[in-house]
Amino acid sequence: MNYKFFIIAKKIEPFYQEAIEEYFKRLQRFCSISLSICKNSKKLPVKDLEKSYKILITPQGKTISSEKFALKIKDLEMKSITDITFLIGEGIEIFDEIFTISQMKMSKGLIATLLAEQLYRAYKILRNEPYHK
């Protein structure tokens, strides 16, 4: 499975970047994953995104439990969807599904960190592995 995180922001704080990289490192044994930061939604590589299943992360999205998120990942894999793009930010009009991390407003770096953690947790759930060491 290939995942892309696109964050619509001028920048994210270095401590969020470090946390995201830590989860990406943990996820490498399960999937391929990358992060891109775009200053505005008009700079998204729309042509590249056409082939990908796009999940918009916004406070207006639907809530989903960790277990249901894991099942969603499994369901997409079963449907032979190999590319999933998570879009974090405003002004995004192309997506297949909308989720929320929280209905509270928070920084995009924090949202990406929490999403990376939940993706890692999803793989641990799907493999019946303990999450905490």
UniProtKB/Swiss-Prot annotation:
It is found in: Cytoplasm. GO terms for cellular component: cytoplasm. Its EC number is 2.1.1.177. InterPro entries: Alpha/beta_knot_MTases, RlmH-like, tRNA_m1G_MTases_N. It catalyses: pseudouridine(1915) in 23S rRNA + S-adenosyl-L-methionine = N(3)-methylpseudouridine(1915) in 23S rRNA + S-adenosyl-L-homocysteine + H(+). Its main location: cytoplasm. It is an enzyme of class 2 (transferase). Disulfide bonds: none annotated. GO terms for molecular function: rRNA (pseudouridine-N3-)-methyltransferase activity. Keywords: Cytoplasm, Methyltransferase, rRNA processing, S-adenosyl-L-methionine, Transferase. Signal peptide: none annotated. S-adenosyl-L-methionine binds at residues 57, 89, 101-106. Transmembrane segments: none annotated. Belongs to the RNA methyltransferase RlmH family. PANTHER family: METHYLTRANSFERASE, RIBOSOMAL RNA LARGE SUBUNIT METHYLTRANSFERASE H. Specifically methylates the pseudouridine at position 1915 (m3Psi1915) in 23S rRNA. Homodimer. This is Ribosomal RNA large subunit methyltransferase H 1.
